[in-house]
């Protein structure tokens, strides 16, 4: 999802990949007027409509959705990845570059090092270093998923950063 500076427009993109090859099967984008003001922790109400439109337009059978957002590692333990996963009734996970809640122990700088994100003693996600000596990304379950599988899949997806790059490029193309 990308917002157009100075305009009330949101651009959303969807990339469907074949697993495990990560071959691009479909790409789609949409631009819509923003109908909900930004409220921290309620991104689904701002970003959900264009994303739902994209999912409804695809003819592909989707087995899992990876959102650039949060699932359980959210102040309400129900971030965009959880919310849209439930609405679509498709397994989902959230992967973000920003930790919203909780904390984790010090991590090794080694690629694929990981530490649980704890909130009040409960594991709500996993901090995962996707590249050596870089800041970690944060993985959490959304809907009908488990953390072990979510982390394993994310490690496979971030080998070349391709999935996020494809989708971000598509969002920028939609803006043009």
Which residues are covered by each model-predicted region?
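A charged, well-structured terminal subsegment
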Residues: 124-144
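Flexible, glycine/charged-enriched surface loops at secondary-structure junctions
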Residues: 160-166
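Single conserved hydrophobic/aromatic residue that forms the stacking wall/gate
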Residues: 168-176
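A contiguous pocket-lining binding segment that forms or flanks enzyme active sites
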Residues: 77-123
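Polyanion-binding surfaces on beta-sheet-dominated domains and ring/shell assemblies
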Residues: 45, 51, 57-58, 73, ...
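A glycine-rich, hydrophobic loop/mini-helix early in the fold
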Residues: 7-58
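Two-metal-ion RNase H-like nuclease active-site motif
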Residues: 1-4
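Catalytic-site beta-strand/loop segments enriched in glycine and acidic/polar residues
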Residues: 51-84, 88-90
